[in-house]
A protein has these predicted regions:
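Canonical Rossmann dinucleotide-binding motif of NAD(H)/NADP(H)-dependent dehydrogenases/reductases
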Residues: 8-41, 187
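Catalytic loop of short-chain dehydrogenase/reductase
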Residues: 140-193, 205-207
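Conserved NAD(P)H cofactor-binding loop of Rossmann-fold oxidoreductase domains
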Residues: 93-98, 205, 260
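Short C-terminal tail/terminal secondary-structure segment
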Residues: 2-5, 24, 158-161, 240, ...
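Short, small/polar-rich loop/turn modules that mediate ligand/substrate recognition or access, typified
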Residues: 192-197, 250-252
Length: 264
């Protein structure tokens, strides 16, 4: 097979969760899969943003989904199978953040975050895997350097994002993204026999689309070997690679796209 053909996703059906925000990782994922030839569904609870994003990509389909509602997750997979007859690629990108959560946040908030993020990830993966068992497929979990490393206080100094060293980012986010890494390995170990590959992509913060960097962006960038945050196309190549035949022998892997941040 020609190497360029290995990166083609023609004939594949993909689902990207949380792709409605043009400033987020999901937008890059959806755009990359679409450009590589896949039929792409995007799902989020904000249909206005989803529709606005999809309008720029003829044929891209939108589905409303709230991570906190199990029935929504079942509906998304069912609708894709009903309309397209298959599902080949799942990108678990959606996340419900516990904003500015402190060390002493109420346990109800912590539990709600786990339900929306960890539990939803598990259910989406399970349902997608069932849909993929006949033909195989690729599941890609969008992680973070926060799932690999402890809190780097230098990123947040004098940004207004931190109080007493533990205000931001959320401890629940670190907990969930760290768990995502090992869940990826576990899922890969049980789904390999069905030719379903499961991988993770761990990223750093995104550059602002308008180019207006704040103190956080400047400090975060200075901690990378390439001197910047993740650009609006830096994720696309990795996603297409993990989604298609180019990575046929790659599973249980964490692809780190961080400009060398974790190498220091």
């Amino acid at each position: 097979m020609n190497v360029l053909e290995m990166f083609s996703l023609a004939g594949k059906v993909a689902l990207v969760t949380g792709a409605g925000d043009r400033k987020g990782y999901g937008a890059q994922c959806a755009e990359a899969l679409y450009e590589a030839g896949a039929e792409v569904y995007i799902a989020s609870r904000n249909m206005e943003k989803l529709s606005a994003f999809a309008a720029g990509y003829p044929g891209m389909k939108t589905i409303e989904m709230d991570l906190e509602k199990e029935c929504d997750i079942h509906h998304v997979i069912s609708q894709i199978l009903r309309e397209s007859g298959r599902l080949d690629i799942l990108v678990n990108n959606a996340v419900a953040r516990t904003a500015l959560a402190q060390w002493d946040l109420p346990m109800a908030d912590f539990d709600r975050s786990l339900h929306a993020n960890a539990s939803a990830l598990f259910l989406l993966t399970r349902l997608a895997a069932e849909a993929m068992k006949e033909r195989g497929g690729s599941i890609i979990n969008i992680g973070s350097y926060m799932g690999m490393l402890g809190l780097d206080h230098a990123n947040y100094e004098n940004t207004g994002m931190q109080t007493d060293g533990i205000r931001w980012p959320s401890p629940a986010y670190h907990y969930e993204k760290g768990g995502m890494l090992n869940f990826t390995r576990w899922a890969a170990s049980v789904l390999g026999k069905y030719d379903i590959r499961v991988n993770c992509v761990s990223l750093i913060g995104l550059e602002p689309l308008d180019g207006e960097r704040n103190r956080f962006h400047r400090q975060h960038s200075s901690r990378t070997l390439l001197g910047r945050c993740c650009g609006n196309e830096d994720l696309k190549g990795g996603i297409v690679y993990l989604a298609g035949k180019a990575s046929n022998f790659v599973t249980g892997h964490n692809l780190v796209i961080d400009g060398g941040y974790s190498a220091i």
